[in-house]
Amino acid sequence: MQIRRIDAGLALFIGLIVLAMARYGAEAFASGPWTMADDARQFLAWGARIGNPSAMPHDLLADYWQQAAPPLYRALLYGANALGIGPVGIASLLAFPLIGASALLTWRLAGCFALDRSRKLFAAICVMAAILHNDSIFSGTPRAFASPLILMMMLGMATRRHGLTLAGLLLSSLIYPAPAITCLGIFALHLMDWRWPWTLRWRSVAMLALAGVTVVASGLFFKAGLADWGPTLLLQEARNVPSLATFDGRSSIVGRSGDVAWLCSARIGFLPAIVNCQGNGDPRLILNALLSVLPIIALWITGRRRHDQNPNAATAWPLLPYSLISSLICYSLAALVAFTFHLPARYSQPVLLVMGSLAFGLLTGGWWSRGMDRLARSRPMARMAIITIAALIGIAAFATPKMRLVRPASSDLVALIASTPHGTRVAGIDDDLAIIPARTGRTVLATPEHDIPYHRRYHRDHQALLRSSMAMGELQQPVLTAEVRRQNIDLLIFDRHFLESGVLPASYSAALPPPHRIAPSFDRIAPLRAASCRVIETPQWVAIFTSCLKRPAP
C-alpha cells in the first residue's frame, strides 16, 4: 500500500489559518454578548427591516445605509434571515468562510508563481498575513469580500481560466465595485498580446467588452441608487468637513501637517496600510512600500519568471506589474474626481495588498531557500535557530489578526435599550449609541460613527440631527420638550460626564464643527424627576424616558 507523504508546508499553512480562525472565534463569540465588527455598525443600521420591512420608520440612518448596501450584500442578509440567522450573526460568521476561501485561493495562486516549496509557502503566508492584518475580512461588510474575490480573479488569469475571472468580476461588481474596476484593467492588460506588433484577438475583445459592460453597469446602477442622497462631496469641500479635514477625524484624509495624505491613509492613500500610517511624511509609509509596491517593481525588473519551470509562470508573472499599473491608473482617475466614484484608496489598496504581499513572499521565499541550503551544509545549528525564530514570528502574526471588534463600554445600557419596545426612538450623546441600531433594532437619531460625509444631503441632515441631540443634552425647557416632540424621541441617553462637564465626547467633537460644549446640565435632571419623568442614573450614563414630556399640557 502506497503511503502518501504529508506536505509539511501545506500542513503549517493550514495550522496557521486555523490559529487565526480560532483567535477570531474567541474574540467575536466569547468576549461579550454585544460584540460586533466596527464597520458593521454602519452597514447593519437598517438590519431590523430585514425581518420586518415596516421597522424603523422615518429613520435617516436606516434609510441611507439600506440604500448603501450593494445588491449582493443585501441578498446575503435576506438569505441568512430566511435560515434564521440575524444580520449581526451572519456578519460575524462571514469571516470563517472568507478566510478559508482566501487561504485556498492563495495557496493555489502561489503555486502558479513558484514550484519551489519554500517560495510557495512564503508567498502564501505573506498574502494571508497581510489580509489578516488588514481588518477588511473581519468587517462583516461588503469590503470583507474584496480579498477573496481579487484572489479569485487573479487565479483565473494566472491559470487562463477566464470563466473564473469573469465570475469574480461579476461578483465583485455586485458587492464591492471599486476593486472590480482595477481588476478589469488588469484583465485588459492580461488579454493583450504584447509581442510586436501589438494585437488583441476578437475573442479577447468580446470577453473584455462583456466584462467591462458587467462591471461598469453594476457600478453605475449602484451609484444611481444613492443619487437621492447626493450630490457627492468634492475634494475642496472635504477640507471644510471636520471628520475629513482633521487628523483624528473618523474619516480623516489628511496627515498631521493638514495636507491630503495621498501616499498613505486608509481612505485616500495609494499604498495599502499593511502597517497603519497616515500622511505623506509618515515614516511608516516606507515600510508599507517595502511590503507591497517595491517587491513588485523588484520582480518586474529582475524578471523572476525564468526561475521556475512552471507551466503557469509565463501567464502568472506579468500579473504583478499589471496590478501595479492598473492600480496606479485607476487610483489616479478616482483621485481626480474624488469622491464621485467612491474613495480613491479602494481602487489601489485592496489589489496591492494581495499582489504586493505575494511579491514580497516570493522574494523572501527565494532568499530563504538559498540561505537555508547554505546553512544546512555549513551551520546546521544556526539553521535550526533561524527556522525556530521564523516559526515563532509566523505564529505571532497569525495569532494577532487585526479584527477591529467593538464592545459597548456599558453593556447594561445596551441591555436596557434592547428591553424597550421595538419602535423605540433613541437620541442623546453617548458613544455606545453607535451599536444600538444594528444590535437592538431600535432607531437612534444620530451618532458620530454614522456621520459619513461623502453624500452631501445625508451628511447635512445627519449633522442637523447631531446638533439636535446636543441641544437636548442641555435639558433646558422649553427647548427640550420641543425637540423631543419634533423628533418623536422616546428615550434620551447621555454620557454622564457630558452632562456634568458640558464637554462633548471626543468622537462627537471630531464629527462636529465648534462649539464642542454646552453649559453643564446635570442639575436639570431633578426637575425632570419632579415632572414624573422616569430617570435611570449610573456612574457612566443617564437614561431619561420622555413620555412625561410628550403628554399634552393640562
Model-identified regions with their sequence ranges:
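Signature aromatic-anchored transmembrane alpha helix within multi-pass, membrane-resident enzymes
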Residues: 13, 212-213, 365-398
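Transmembrane alpha-helix segments characteristic
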Residues: 307-337, 359, 388
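Active-site lumenal/periplasmic loops and adjacent helix-entry segments of GT-C-fold
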Residues: 10-148, 175-177, 400-404
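Membrane-interface transmembrane helices that cradle and orient dolichyl/undecaprenyl
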Residues: 145, 150-164
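Hydrophobic/aromatic-rich transmembrane helices and adjacent perimembrane loops
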Residues: 340-372
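Extracytoplasmic
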Residues: 396-554
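Transmembrane catalytic cores of multi-pass membrane glycosyltransferases
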Residues: 22-28, 32-39, 51-58, 64, ...
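Start-transfer (signal-anchor) and selected internal transmembrane alpha helices
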Residues: 1-26, 206-209, 554
